[in-house]
Design a protein with these regions (language model features):
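Conserved P-loop
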Residues: 2-94
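Hydrophobic/aromatic ligand-binding patch that stacks against planar heteroaromatic rings
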Residues: 26-28, 132, 173-174
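Short, well-ordered beta-strand core segments
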Residues: 34-36, 140, 181-183
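Conserved nucleotide-binding/hydrolysis micro-motifs of P-loop NTPases
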Residues: 40-44, 83-85, 146-150, 187-190, ...
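P-loop NTPase motor core
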Residues: 85-170
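Long, low-complexity, intrinsically disordered segments
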Residues: 266-288
Length: 288
């Protein structure tokens, strides 16, 4: 057995989630030579390379297979924008497979058997992303929106905090897989003013300064494996300064091959507006 000693530098697996309009996509666009898997349809005004808007989970898989194929496409970072919109495609595909007019969402499936149907999709997605990272040397950036949910602490009273806007099983899988789970937010302070009749009220002030939380706190879910400071500026370079640069490129040899079918015109360059065309639905087989 080959023994690996010390630190091994490898492409990062990053999940960045945050409030609407905080600049998640703009942050990811500063990563090395990124290609966006365009699921949410919010990239028209962002200068980046992107796929057309992908309307089914099959199209997402096909895009991932194309990136992992034998062609040297030159992209260094894959960005999925966003995970919560991708989850909708997964749930939509499973509802269609059930083929029951009474079932509109996976929540409608009885005995708690609905949402577990999505787990194999996330397993396949992580295998595709592992392939891109290990064989193609691509950094993986996963973007998602935030939600406020109740956290039942075993050590204190329950309280609200920000979490990833995904079903809890999918959220747990992705958090475990990623090296960094980062929370992006606007910095808001409060001030107190007189409200009359001897009462006071608090007002929110600020809201323009943006920052990234890198470690768990009472307000949000977060983690990192780089020893990052608890907060970073909302800037890719501020994060990248802590990433170890690989000295030796190691590859795991797997049987990679491109997807079947016509995939010409998959990538939309620059800030050109997507016409929403799809890349076609094909039978998907894993490339490894």
């Amino acid at each position: 057995m080959r023994i690996i000693k010390g630190i091994v530098a490898a492409p990062r697996r990053i999940l960045l989630y945050g409030q609407h309009g905080v600049g998640k996509s703009s942050w990811a666009a500063k990563a090395p030579n990124p290609i966006f898997i365009n699921v949410e349809d919010g990239l028209c005004d962002l200068e980046c390379d992107k796929t057309p808007v992908l309307r089914s989970i099959t199209e997402v898989y096909e895009a991932l297979i194309w990136l992992g194929g034998e062609e040297d496409h030159g992209y260094k970072t894959i960005v999925i924008d966003t995970l919560d919109w991708m989850e909708r495609l997964i749930h939509q595909a499973e509802v269609e497979l059930i083929n029951d007019r009474k079932i509109k969402t996976l929540a409608d499936v009885g005995f708690g058997k609905g949402y577990p149907r999505a787990i194999p999709h996330w397993d396949v997605t992580l295998k595709y992303l592992d392939h891109l990272r290990r064989v193609k040397g691509m950094t993986v950036v996963l973007l998602a929106h935030a939600k406020v949910e109740r956290f039942e602490s075993p050590e204190a009273d329950s309280y609200d905090r920000y979490s990833i806007d995904l079903h809890k099983t999918a959220s747990g899988m992705l958090q475990e897989w990623c090296d960094e789970v980062l929370f992006a937010a606007f910095r808001v302070n409060t001030r107190t003013e007189e409200a009359g009749f001897g009462k006071e009220r608090k007002l929110a002030v600020g809201g323009k300064d943006r920052y990234i939380r890198t470690s768990e706190s009472a307000s949000c879910i977060a983690k990192n494996r780089l020893g990052l400071p608890s907060e970073l500026p909302m800037d890719w370079d501020a994060y990248a300064a802590y990433v170890r640069k690989p000295s030796v490129k190691e590859q795991v040899q797997v049987g990679a091959r491109p997807a079947s079918g016509n995939i010409e015109g998959l990538v939309v360059n620059g800030s050109s507006k997507s016409n929403g065309s799809s890349v076609g639905v094909v039978e998907i087989e894993t490339p490894f």
